[in-house]
Each structure stands twice: as C-alpha cells, then as structure tokens.
C-alpha cells in the first residue's frame, strides 16, 4: 500500500484522541469502559394532568450498566410505582409516568439518575418535575370602572399563576381585538393601560383572555365594564408613569439571555416614550423597541450591558422618567470541562474543572456519585484550584468523577472517568507500507501505537541503528517520524518499534524519494490592450515515473476550456485568453503537479485601454448663471491601468442641436472640477469624457440641464464679401453666426453699404438671411460694407468695414504676344505683354494659354483636335509649354480672364524641330543555321523627324571576348538583316536603334539569343498525347530560340501483330514549330507507342490508347459528302463568305490607306477629353499625357508583351508568303522568293498577309 505523504499531516492533529478512548483499531482485547451518560431529560419538566411524563437516562459502558434513581434525595424505584412504565431497552434507565391516571401531582420533585458498572458510577444532573393542574380564574365580582373623559385608567387582568406564563389577549364579546396604540396598550403583566380615555372607549365588554400552551386551553376573565363620563373641559396634564410607579428600580439580567424593560405613562396629550443609556451608546444591533416604544428588549445580554437605562415620557406639558439600574450576572458556564482519560499504572491523573459565573460558582467534587468527604479517607485525592489530582494510580483507582458548580442562577455537572488499564503495546499502522515524497520536501512515516502504559516508540534504519543521529529526522509524540529536506539517498526501509512493560512490536515502512517537479519556464507578466489576446507559456520537468499535468489558475480559480465559449484555449502548456476585458486582469498561475507535489509560477496580467465612464457629474454654484458661469465637478474615472491625461468637457443643446455635442475644453487628468464660462441663452447639458494614452473612454451620464440668460450679441459675422453675380448688382454675403453665438432665441443682421471714397450716408437694411442683394449698381464699383448682429437684447459690437465690388463684365482686351522661344524639340516659352487693367472690367484673375497639335511638318492631321490648357496667375506674362511632339506644328492662344469669364484671344502658330526617334518595334530573332540568325523588326511608332536608317550592334553575353560589332544600316525602309559567322556556343545581346537627320541614334530595343547549337538536343516542352476512337493528337511547346527542324513521328500499335501491316500508320515528317500533329486512321481501343525520330536518333517517346469518345474521320467512299444536299450546303456557305469578303473590302477602301512610317502622323488620342472653356485650374498640359500613346485597338502594346517572331509562332502562321523546303537534317534548302520579299518590303501601306519581314498585321 502506497501512502501519499501530502495527505498525512492533517491526521497528526487527531493524535490527542488516544487519551480519550481506546482506538477502534485496537482489536483482539476485550477492553472495559466506565459508564458514560449519553442522554438525559432537561433540568426542568412542566407537565399537566393528562400528559405522559418521560424521564430519560441512557448510558453506555462495559460491562452492562445498571441504573438507579433518587427523588428529592431518597432512593426511588420506578418499577414499584403504580402507573410507572420502565423502559427495558439496553443501555436505558428511562421510565414513563402515564398521564391518564392523573398521577402527575404525586410525582412532583427533583430526580437524579445513577448509571453504574464495576468500574464506577456516572450521575445525571438534577431533573425538576413540576406538575400543574388545569388553570382556573378565581371567582370574583367585577365592578364597573367609572372614569371621566381624559383621565387615565388601568384594567387589571391578573391571570392564574403558572410555571409557564400564559399569553394574554384583550378582546370584546365579539372576539375582536382591542385596538392598541400609543394611548391604549397592554403591559407585560397583562393589564390594559389607558393614558387618557375617550368617550369612544365606553364599552361594557373588555375581556382578558389567557392562553396556556401547555394545557392547550384559553380561559377568560369576567368582562369589565368601562364607563366614560363625557366632559366639556378636558384638562391637559403632564406625563405620569403608571408602570413602574417609582422613580427607579434595580434589575438583574442574566448573561446570554434577553432583558425586557417597560415604561407605561399616562397624561394628556398622550405622552411619547423614548429610552436613554447615559453611560454608553445604545447597542442598536441588539435592541428591539416594541409596544409603541413602551418596551425595550435587549438581546444576548453581556457584561458590558451593566448600567443605567432610562425611559422618558414626554408631552407638551412636561415629562416623567424612570431609571432602571441593571446588573448583569451569569449562571455557571464552563471554562474548562473535565475530560475522561486512560492511564497506565503509576501515572498521575489530573482532571481540570474550571467554571465561571456571577457570582462565582461553588465547585464540589464527587466520586462515583458520592461526596469527597465520604470516599477520601486515606487522603489519596487532592484538589488544587478546582482540579482533582491523583498520584501513582493503580487499576483499583478506576472511577467516575463528577464536578458540580452552583450559584443562585443555576448549576453545572460534568462526569469524567479515570480509567487505569494495562494493555500490551500494539502498532495500529499497517505494516510494510510504502511512502512516496519528492526531493526537498518532508516525509511523514506513520507509526500509531497504543498500549497501557503508553508504549515508547523509536525508529531504526536498515542496519538497526536509530535514525535520530541525522538532525533532519524528528519523531512526534504520536509516533510519526518526519524527514525534512528529503534527498535521493533517503530512499530505503525504516523500522518502527513500540514497547511497554508487557511487550514490544515492530513494523516496516518503505520510503521512495522522487525527483521534485520544477517549472523550467514560467509565464511572464503581460500588459495588453482590451480586446487583444494574450498567451502565457509554461514548461516543467517531472519525475518520469509519476503521472504529471500542467493546469492553469486565474486568481486562484481553476481555468478550463468551455464548449460554449472560446474565451480560453489551453494546449501544450499554453494558455491563450481571447478578447481581453478588464475583468480578465489579475494573477494567472501555471500549476505543474504530480500525485506527490505541485509547484506554481505566477504572472500578472494588466488589461489596459481607454478609461471608463466618468461618474457622479454634479452642477453647483448656480447663482453664477447670471454671469454665464457654472461649476461642474465629477469623480475620477477608472483609468484601466493607464493614467488619465485629461478630461474633455462637452455640452449639448437639446433645443437648438439635439444629439450634437460640442467641446467646451479640456482639463488635466488630476483635476475633477472646473468653473465653465458659458454663452448666453444656451440650454446646456454636460458630459465629461476621460482620456488616456489609449484614447477617450465612454462619456459620462449626462448632467441635468441649465439655461443661461439672454444677452446682446458679442460677435459679428465674419467673411463679409461683396461680389456681383450680374453686371449691375452686388451680392453681400457673410458667414452667419453659430446658434450658440446668438445669445437669444433669434438673430438678425444689420447690413450697411455706401460707395467707397464718397462720404455718402450709409444705406442700411436688417435681414434674417445671410445675404443681401443690392441692385442697380454700376459695373465693377467698390463699396464699403458693414454687417452687424442684432437680437432682442441689443446690437453686437461695432463692425469692421469691408470693401466689396459690384458685378464684373467680360474682359474687353486681348494680351499682345511678344515672342515664342524654342528651347528644344519638345519645349517652348510663350511671352506676352500685360493687359490694360481698365479694360479687364473686373479683377484680373490670370491668363489662359490654350494650345493644340496641328500635325507633323510632313502632314497635317485631319483628326479630332485636342486642346491643352495652362492657367497662369495675373502677375505672370509667360508660360512654358512642355511635352510637345518633335517635328510638329502647334497653334497657341492667350486670353485674360476675370470672375466673369474669358476675354478675346491672341493667336500664334509655331513648329518644333526634329528630335530623337523612338525605339524600333518588335525585334525578332530567327534561327537560320547553327551560325546564322535573321533579325527582323518594325520601325518606331514615333519618328520625331525623317528617318535616315538604323544602327545595329551586338556582342556575346558571356565568354572572354565581349567585342561590340556595329552595322550602320542606311536604308530607312529596311526591315530585316541577316547575321552570319556566329559562334553556336555563345549567347548574344542584340541592340537596334533608329536615326534621323537631326538626332540619333534614338532609344534602343534589346534582345538576347543564339543559334540552335547553343541549346543542344531539341526540347519538346510539355509534350502530351490525347486520343479519340480512331485518331490521336500529339502536342508540344516549342522552346524559345530553338531553330526549326523536321523529324519523323511514328505510331506503333501494341502488342505487335495486333494490327495488320496494311493498317499500320506510316511515318510522317513534322516541323518542330508547328506545335502539334494529328494522326488519323488508328484502330479503336488500341494502345500505340509514339516515337519522335530525327536522323535515326530517338528524340522522345510516349504511349496513348484510342477509345470511342472522339470524332471519327470518315472515308470519302460512299460517304454523305457525295450526297447532293451536302454539296448544296457547302456551296451556300462559300457564297456567304464571298459576300462578306466583298463587304469588308469596300469598307476598308473607304477607310483609306497609310504607310507604317506615317503612323505617328495619324495617331488618335483615345483618352483625350476637351476642357470646358469656363474651367481653369493649375498649370497642366494634357499634351504630355496623350501624345505618346499607341493607336488604341489598331496597334500592339508597347509593354514588352509582344512575342518575338520565330519563337512561339509556327511557320504555318506565315501563310503563303514564304516557300520553305527541308533536307532530312531539317536545314533550309530554299530561300524566300524574290517576289514575296519585294511585296513584303514595299507593303507598308497594305494590310495583306503576314510574313516574317512584315509583322504589322500579326501584331494586331
């Protein structure tokens, strides 16, 4: 059996129980036990004639206990009494007096039970039996009570005496309760008190009812007739106490019980009662006021409640008082109750009996129910300070003692035995137990021994020597051995030996010391924002032989993943907390535990964020509202772990701008109040928002609203302007005041104006709108203008004078051009002379320069004209036009403009010189042989002058020699050039540039490439084969730069012999650049092996299997193609195609023809957008945005996406423009025909078939 040591320590606390009784584990010995009373009747029993009376007395002991009773100190034998039934149950001496014989009165008295066996006698406490008869009210004659109105009266009750006080109720003959209040009330004695009587109290049936719960009966007193004599003059009188009647009294209160004090007063008007405790404050938590304050009940009386309690009765004429002097006393109570003990021979027995009470109780000792004087003849017992002491006890000294304490308030009794026994030593802990603990902890090896005398216990190691030589080993009195600071070498066997004068016994304990659990990486404290997530990591090392786990706690609570929430994610020693809130902050612990130990590592999480709402907004100093001020205060907001930097104070006017908040300012974060400067006539509702480094928090709840008084405006409108929108008027405008500056419910504006420089009378008008139109003015005349705010409280401050102007007219003068300076082929400077301001008819805003391209110098454009604009300020008389096309004609116009619009234009025409041409288009490399390449290209899109030819250069990309070779090609119409004597092992970089008469070479186009030998064996990229029922398609991607060649393709049916030789496909010649080949007339559902062969060298092979899913090539013999309907159908299609071709030819003829070299003259700006005449912006030129764009849909993109001819294009794309023949090795044996080449070279104006030297159409 393995004992987990961390659960052992609490067991040690129970070790004192060995002194109280023999352990249950001590088996095999018939141990005797002195009598112990287990149940007895209460100290006082009140019974009635019909009740059964049970007197209980039960006790345990070995041998069997015998019982006897005394009544009033005389031996009482229940079995011999008539009407008494004795309980025959084991361990019981109880008996019952049957109530149906009305014997209760005869059995009144004080009883005591004695339980005895040969070891001693136990004694019960005294049981007082009180028998009562049926309660009866004595016969009496009740006389009417006569009293004058306003006087006091007491109606007596005087119920029959009883051991159990009855409950009193006052009712009338109709069984209705007598209403009680401050004037009429019942005292604790049952009497009914009237502080003063009224005529309404005149009744003849005041009946006192007494309820006796013990007999379950209610008896009535004879009705009392209360006669009230009316009077016309009720005399006021000061209070007088009806109970108690004297000025003071003394009471004794028992500690722990309740104290009831009562004061009932009479007087007119009816007095009120209050209670005073002069020495100390009244203990309000234990005081109950009842009966309209006439009764004070003090609960759980203690010694501190000693002292004076005064009741004070008051009305308008005076007062009366009574002083209760309360003394707190106590019945006896235990400080230390004597306990039963087991002793061995020769030991000293001591029984302590410490009792307290007020007055101090008297303590007496009994032995086996007999007084000390009777049994202590040899003076063996002695009593010291209430304790009973016996020295050198022997088995014959076994006894049961009684300690009894008594004062006038009660008595206490306790039985305790001294049991002197002789028992052999026995170890109650199981033998050969295994204990496990971890290094560094404390192990507890148990050895619970029992015997009489108490055995001595010692621990030995495997060699039989005591273990106490090591200071880490410590034995406890209960036999347990503790080993602190455990080490791995403490593992082993230990022996516990217990011995007394009768025998000795030994048990074995096995100790295993394991590695202690350690946290190698604990969680680290973190500060995270609200809404973020945090990850805590924990790693630990464990003893490999123990089951281990890592768990997490948050503020001491175990954390677990919940299926209905993704708040926590726990896995592999990680704790992830999602969607952090402020409630998540706290201490988080990683707990690494085994069944033996656990270690914990803590980290603190702080959740930071914007502050919480500001609480407790309060307005004060409202008298300052007359000065448009108020004091606002608040309590600090929750800072959420980031100091509050400032508070933002905002207001809302629910009348003028509901749900819109305006800032009144900010105060430092350590300030929680401020006096606000307010505007007149605003309905203010305030709120405050706290701000820290993470931003503003939630706004506070809104404050109550306040309204400031009205006042005259303190501001005038700003941004006053005078401008005409017609030539004969002036529109005066201004920025209206915000409503919070009105200072009143409404606002108006007093507008004044007069011509500038003339001391004329101000013309004025008051308006509500933020504008005024002044009509019938002269064109562009200056005016002095003033605008003043006005409300029902007065005018605003004196306004400032603003100069405005009446309406403008169009300028009447055009700028005179001075000259045009040409900087280069794309930039010119245009200059003009300033215009006469008197002719502008308004404010000169600037000049508008308009220019547009008319065409190249060789040919003017007939296309849509796009105009570009530049706007320059009024103080500038020149403009730079940039981004122009070289070798082109331009038209320029300059106009002055004012607020009304543009004036007349000055015109000029100029031309730009030739410039550098653009780069040639579409440079392609075509392999001719392993040492030669054919280059072909297209001319530049932008000639920028007259082309004079091309400059071609190239050099190897790698290798030792990088000599640059140049070819000056002087024919501008040239489109191809053949290069020979190239090294087949090198890669070359080719560069081609165009030239003009005045510039060049221009921008270059660059390509890299080489001949076939550079790339070695041909590459069939992404080759694949697909099949139908009787055909197969082989497809591949020709490699870029690879020379074209021919090869055989052979389909061979598998297995051999499946297909007859007549149906075997014959080898076919295929060109590399054609990218695919289709083989027909294959057999369905047959596997074929495909071989690609060149000069008996296998280039590639693959397999394919035919099926029935594809189209079937049909033989012409007997097919539907010979049917008449099919021939007619094909003829109709051909006819339709001819008609379409004719229509297309007609349409192209109407569109005109143009050569490639003139394309730059006919380009159209597809994105051109004409500028509105009335729109003038910053300096800009749309020319540069659009001049260099391609033709749109008719020209290729210039972004490099065009594939070079001869790379991915197959020879089939060239149509009939080239005659090509191949030898067996794939080399060319023919040349381009002279006719085709001539047509291609001179076909720039046509859109005929594409050829290798005329790719214009192929680029589309």
From Swiss-Prot:
Lineage per the UniProt record: Eukaryota, Metazoa, Chordata, Craniata, Vertebrata
Chain location of the short sequence motif Cell attachment site per the record: 553-555, 562-564
Polar residues bias locations: 1244-1253
Family: Belongs to the immunoglobulin superfamily. L1/neurofascin/NgCAM family.
Bias type Basic and acidic residues, positions: 712-724
Organism: Mus musculus
Positions in the Extracellular compartment: 20-1123
This protein's name: Neural cell adhesion molecule L1
GO cellular component, one term: terminal bouton
Xref: Gene3D superfamilies: Immunoglobulins
Record's bilayer topology term: Single-pass type I membrane protein
PANTHER family given in the database record: CTX-RELATED TYPE I TRANSMEMBRANE PROTEIN (PTHR12231), L1 CELL ADHESION MOLECULE (PTHR12231:SF241)
Gene name, Swiss-Prot/TrEMBL: L1cam
